[in-house]
UniProtKB/Swiss-Prot annotation:
Keywords: Capsid protein, Helical capsid protein, Host cytoplasm, Phosphoprotein, Ribonucleoprotein, RNA-binding, Viral nucleoprotein, Virion. Its main location: virion. It is found in: Virion; Host cytoplasm. The gene is N. This is Nucleoprotein. GO terms for cellular component: helical viral capsid; host cell cytoplasm; ribonucleoprotein complex; viral nucleocapsid. Belongs to the cytorhabdovirus nucleocapsid protein family.
């Protein structure tokens, strides 16, 4: 029999064994990833695509040799009487909202036929592109109440010019009326105006009004109808500044927004008209001898400001920051550089270094400024929709360091209006810091007075 002592000993042994099992450490599962001894291998499967861009991101470099391949219409300038005939038909079509493809042709012919400002007689402002500039497309010159032109002989032209000069100095009303009748008859003959559809030619200044108005309408290629209507008062005032004559034609021009929408849609269907107009503009901006200051100012207003650097807001903002603050481009581009902006910043570097007219390169041409009107792939890395981060930061900095004036708020640029709040929250401090640094460089150097060292918020 088992004694009590043996039973107690056995129970004690079981207790010890159980305690040993409970106290035995359990295996812990590590939350850290298992690091193998094998070295990591770089994935090279996609290396062949490292330098590939497709679609809108493809960027093309401009060369002046490309001018010869630009498709343009074989359009011809017309004299004052025909400008008036076409101009009246143009305004009638817009007024009646009967816009069609011929209306677009009217605008082009009238724009290229615009006369020089501040002249006492009608002379075309623009020189046509040479045969080597552009690839000609067939174009039918529009006719408006005009029969076949009969023209004037050399003697008749001399008579017409002499009569115009006499009219300028004549004070006798009877003689002035006679001179005006002679001029009207000869201008009608020069333009080939028939008797059944004769167009009354009031003066050459009226021709200036139609040419000017047509050129402003071509701005609808790049601006909204709302913006055009809002700027009509300024258009009338600017015409009066360049042409010393009544602006009755412009005052009478009261287009409906519906008609302008139709015209803008008609323009969109004819991109070759824009190619033609901008090449005429670029040729005259670069011609030798150049335009007079007043003439270039007129061309700047009508076309250069609207069609230079199209869709390249980041680049024009960088130029504006440089001009307003004096910050060196080398410093400015360094500040703007990051992985998200690098393609656009590098493109800006190439534009400034290789294309722009500078102190070291005063003889360069400016055709590159209009290149994106001819092919949107030129300088594609600076297209606003392709470099929104750069546009946003440049716009924010520009707003903080320069006066906006008539150019409006750069933060209203369409490409950045709908940026998500998350990225804006990340970019705003960048712009704030950058603006402060630019202002420091703008206001402080070793010779600045002590007061300039006071820093203020750029907000």
């Amino acid at each position: 029999m088992t004694t009590s002592a043996e039973k107690l000993a056995k129970l004690e042994q079981l207790r010890k064994e159980r305690a040993a099992v409970i106290q035995k450490p359990t295996t812990q599962v590590s939350s850290e990833p298992v690091v193998t001894e094998k070295p990591r291998v770089r994935n090279t499967a996609y290396d062949s695509l490292a330098g590939v861009t497709i679609g809108k991101r493809a960027s093309r470099k401009w060369s002046d040799a490309d001018i010869k391949s630009i498709p343009i219409y074989d359009v011809h300038q017309v004299p004052a009487a025909q400008v008036i005939a076409l101009g009246k038909d143009l305004l009638t079509q817009i007024q009646n909202n009967s816009v069609n493809t011929v209306t677009v042709d009217y605008c082009l012919v009238l724009a290229v036929s615009i006369p020089k400002p501040a002249m006492t007689s009608f002379e075309h402002l623009l020189t046509p592109p040479s045969p080597e500039q552009g690839t000609r497309l067939d174009f039918t010159q529009p006719q408006a109440g005009v029969s076949n032109r009969s023209g004037l002989t050399a003697i008749e032209k001399m008579t017409l010019n002499a009569t115009r000069k006499n009219l300028l100095t004549e004070t006798d009303e009877e003689k002035r009326a006679r001179y005006e009748a002679i001029i009207k008859k000869m201008e009608d003959q020069e333009a080939g105006l028939g008797t059944s559809k004769a167009t009354v030619v009031t003066s050459e200044t009226e021709a200036a009004a139609y040419g000017f108005l047509a050129a402003t309408l071509l701005k609808l290629y790049a601006k909204s109808t709302e913006s055009y209507v809002a700027g009509l008062a300024q258009i009338r005032n600017r015409f009066a500044a360049w042409y010393d004559c009544p602006k009755a034609v412009l005052d009478a021009f009261q287009p409906t927004e519906a008609a302008l929408v139709s015209l803008r849609a008609a323009f969109a269907r004819r991109p070759e008209v824009l190619s033609t107009w901008t090449l005429w503009v670029a040729v005259n901006e670069n011609r030798t001898p150049g335009l007079l200051v007043t003439q270039q100012g007129l061309l700047n207003y009508l076309a250069c400001q609207q069609f230079a650097y199209p869709g390249m807001h980041a680049y024009t903002l960088l130029i504006e920051i440089h001009e307003h603050t004096g910050m060196k481009f080398s410093d400015l581009l360094v500040e703007m550089d990051c992985p998200a902006t690098r393609a656009g910043v590098r493109e800006a570097l190439e534009l400034i270094r290789d294309y722009e007219i500078t102190k070291d390169h005063p003889k360069r041409t400016t055709y590159f400024r209009y290149a994106r009107n001819w092919d949107p792939k030129y300088f594609g890395a600076l297209q606003s929709t392709e470099c929104k981060t750069l546009v946003y930061v440049a716009a924010s900095v520009s707003k903080k360091v320069s006066a906006q004036g008539a150019n409006g708020d750069p933060m209203e640029i369409f490409a950045i209006k709908n940026l998500d709040a998350t990225i804006k929250a990340r970019l705003d401090p960048v712009a704030e810091n950058m603006a402060g640094k630019i202002l420091d460089q703008m206001l402080m150097d070793e010779m600045s007075g002590a007061s300039w060292a006071t820093k203020a918020s750029t907000q």
